[in-house]
């Protein structure tokens, strides 16, 4: 059962208890927020993370962004950035690499931190489409679904999904 389903059935999970204690709110406040979609608690079946509640009625969170580029691919530097962000008190981490071996970079970053790690599957899909087909506009939808699943299986806890991207937008990229 997932957190949303548990919350809707009235079940307060361990994650909800942890968030309530950290935020100074009641467990039922967190449960109701999760059930109604106003609070999220990024978790993953693939790895343990520092539990963090994000949403309405909770403190503002700090999200640190890291990632390689086509100009600089230094995984050790990205891992050090992730560790520094965690030491500095970041609540979550976005891994936004656009250069290098995406899965290897993300795997190593995910292994190096206890923070919830987010990603943007569309970035990888665009770059792979440009490499494979010569242009972003030739991206195949199955590639986006495959990449999204791969990133989830690596242990990313949340994703930015760009639902407003359409064919006309892609032609301009």
Pin down the residues of each PLM region.
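Alpha/beta enzyme core
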Residues: 2-173
């Amino acid at each position: 059962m997932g957190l949303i389903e548990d919350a809707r059935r009235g079940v307060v999970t361990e994650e909800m208890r942890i968030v309530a204690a950290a935020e100074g709110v009641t467990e039922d406040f967190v449960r109701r927020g999760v059930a109604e979609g106003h609070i999220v608690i990024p978790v993953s079946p693939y790895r343990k993370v520092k539990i963090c509640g994000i949403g309405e009625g909770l403190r503002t969170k700090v999200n640190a962004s890291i990632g390689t580029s086509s100009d600089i691919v230094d995984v050790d530097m990205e891992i050090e950035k992730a560790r520094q962000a965690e030491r500095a008190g970041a609540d979550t981490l976005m891994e936004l690499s656009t250069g290098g071996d995406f899965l290897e970079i993300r795997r190593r970053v995910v292994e190096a931190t206890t923070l919830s790690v987010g990603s943007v599957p569309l970035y990888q899909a665009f770059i792979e489409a440009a490499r494979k087909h010569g242009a972003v506009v030739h991206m195949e939808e199955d590639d986006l679904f495959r990449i999204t699943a791969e990133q989830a299986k690596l242990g990313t806890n949340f994703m930015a999904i760009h639902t407003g991207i359409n064919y006309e937008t892609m032609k301009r990229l």
